[in-house]
UniProtKB/Swiss-Prot annotation:
Main subcellular localisation: nucleus
Modified residues (Phosphoserine): 41, 85, 309
InterPro entries listed in its UniProt record: AcTrfase_ESCO_Znf_dom, ESCO_Acetyltransf_dom
Family note: Belongs to the acetyltransferase family. ECO subfamily.
Source organism per UniProt: Mus musculus (Mouse)
Renumbered residue ranges of the record's region Disordered: 267-294
GO biological process per UniProt: chromosome segregation; double-strand break repair; hematopoietic progenitor cell differentiation; protein localization to chromatin; regulation of DNA replication
Coiled coil (UniProt feature): none
Protein name per its UniProtKB record: N-acetyltransferase ESCO2
Amino acid sequence: MMATCTPRKRKRYTLNADNDDSLLTDISSSKLRCAENLFPSPNKKHNYQSSVQKEDKSCSHQLHFPSSPLKTTENSRFSFANHSSLFKPAMSTVSFYSKEKYYLNPLERKLIRECRSICLATESGDKPIPSVTENIQRKPVCTKKNKKKQKSLTAKYQPNYKHIKSKSRNLKNSKPNQVTYKPVVDQENSCFPAKNYPNSPPRVLSQKIKPQVTLQGGAAFFVRKRNSLKKLPLEDKPLLLQKNLPEVPEGAPEAKQIPKSLLVDEKSSVKVQNARSKNEEKLRKNPSGAVVSSKECNLDKHDFPSENSLDENKTISPESVYPIFNVSSVNTKRPEEQSSVGSTACTNFLKQTNVPKNINSRDTNKGGKDQLVIDAGQKHFGTTVCKSCGMIYTASNPEDEIQHLQHHHRFLEGIKFVGWKRERVVAEFWDGKIVLVLPRDPSYAIKKVEDVQELVDLELGFQQTVPVCPDKTKTFLFIDEKRVVGCLIAEPIKQAFRVLSEPSASKECSRAWRCSDVPEPAICGISRIWVFRLKRRKRIARRLVDTVRNCFMFGCFLSTNEIAFSDPTPDGKLFATKYCNTPNFLVYNFHN
């Protein structure tokens, strides 16, 4: 391209002084036209598009270069004569990067800016619009303000602003070269600082992050609270609240985007804090001099919005509104001018209020039973009854367990009945049988009777004595499932004594009772009658006595007036009264 244009040296045309003014005016007019084409007004959009199309066509014509340098000179002469302008090169002054934009010199840019500012001022009338230079000068001021805010606010809780600068050569924007600040409206608040809303989570890279909850436990919570109360007096609280409030201009457009509910909540919170500060001042500045914890909180009804969910009867009390943060009368320092009367009144009042709190729970449980054994959920705990031997003992007690093992082994061996070859079965029942053992029976039978008699004597508390007629005693054993569950020892007697009836008022079973001195004739005396504990209430004792009455004397059935009981226990007395159908049954002394 350059080879075709530079073989010859071009001649410089001299210009007259008269033509200088015309050339300068043409240059300024052409520059103004270019500025108007580059920055069209909103009313001249259609004209601008047509002009752009014409310029594109002219540029396309200019790109077709002439074949010889002579023609280029001729074309330049024609253009100079017609347009009365300076030298125009063959190549159009198109920007290197974009073919649609023209390159402008610094002087041309300055003229365009001045012309553009004048045109915008004339179109808008009295409303001045800041130019690009003015906006550039205002930028450092905005950054300074933001830097000051960063010092006062933490980086986490600072509101996010998007700095958007409109492009100067954008064809669609009606107002170019303007700097706009659009705040990012969060879900809750954007204009007010985050310190007034501690519940709102902080944002990091436009993402919500829940702050880690740290609870001060123990004495650290109260120590920190006291230090804060000492450092910050109560009179300075409303001033601090006013300082913490953000400075919002009256004509700011961002204030319109704030929901009304947030403003109402903020006002109500400020009023509640002011009411708390007033109540705390009343605690300290009491005219009587005595520190009295006033629990009355005077709040205006208009401070809170009415809601349908709240009942009309419910009144707002200081206990319902964070009682932890109320200043207690004990922690506050008393003034130096406090009188002795006020101090006594304060102590008396505090004693009256703290009486129910100082009551110890242990004092109320003094009348209850003392727990001597720790109940840790053991399976075997407390008093238990052995199902096989019937002994009552305390589990988890080593002494009782040892005694239980000894008694259990001895008892099971004593009541165990294997069976004999020659059994003297006196009566048979569906649940067992009764076996009679005489003194002349084999030794294994007599030995078994002695073992059972020893167990019976231990359980009944009977003295081991020698009977009057050992050769005539008869032992009746009730056998059930190869075990001895009942035993009756009978012996012949000659006389017995009648038990005197007691008044109906005292029907308690006691060992001491009275009997008559007049003896009565009797034939059979029942020295011992015993039934296994787990087999009682099954008519075993009754069947044993019936068998004795039938078998004690051959060919004779004894009546209830011919049998007597020897020193019965309370249970034996009830049984004798029930069996004989009278409390005046016969008893005898087996020692005689």
